[in-house]
A protein has these predicted regions:
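Membrane-proximal helical "anchor" segments flanking the first transmembrane region
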Residues: 1-108, 115
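Soluble catalytic domains of membrane acyltransferases
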Residues: 76-182
Length: 182
């Protein structure tokens, strides 16, 4: 909570710098789960994949996750002006999404797993598009509750499970948009 309060109090770029420093320390000094991460990257790309490239993917992934955490912590303060300043092209696509929702009663938006996809939900919320998504449960219940509280600042989160499909259909029929990672 203290770290979250600090990251929220700092100016945005300073908070990102602090997140970068924390990620760099974790990756380069502590090497937390680094061996396992590199093993998994090589499993996907093959044993001949250059070690340098695998390290780069691992580093960028951790760095970007740290940046996403900063945005998640600051989600309650994200307003339309912030969205327009940091994601200038976003407003161009809002009318298209709104038209699809009016025409079909709901929408499914596929989002690549790049960057902070939760930010898409917060941004849509600022433009009046009601979003929801599906998430798995985190192992630590305190972390799970915190992450869901942060995410639900801009969109509803459905926990993956047996009744999820019925909830999805109900929300889509009521004019919501589902953000999903294909």
């Amino acid at each position: 909570r203290l770290s979250a309060a600090l990251l929220k109090a700092l100016p945005y770029r300073a908070a990102l710098t602090a997140a970068w420093c924390s990620a760099a320390f974790t990756f380069h000094v502590c090497r937390f789960r680094r061996r396992e991460t590199l093993r998994r990257i090589r499993e996907v790309f093959g044993p001949d994949y250059p070690a340098r490239d695998a390290r780069r993917i691992a580093w960028l992934s951790l760095r970007n996750m740290s940046f996403n955490l900063v945005e998640m912590i600051r989600a309650q303060d994200i307003d339309r002006a912030w969205i327009d300043r940091h994601i200038p092209a976003f407003a161009l696509y809002v009318p298209q999404v709104q038209a699809l929702i009016r025409r079909y009663g709901g929408a499914v938006i596929t989002v690549p797993h790049m960057g902070n996809w939760d930010l898409a939900g917060w941004a849509c919320n600022q433009y009046g598009i009601r979003m929801f998504s599906i998430a798995g449960k985190q192992k630590n219940p305190l972390v799970n509750d915190w992450v869901n509280r942060q995410r639900e600042t801009g969109m509803a989160i459905l926990e993956r499970g047996s009744g999820t499909l019925k909830q999805i259909i109900k929300l889509l029929r009521s004019g919501n948009a589902l953000a999903i990672l294909p």
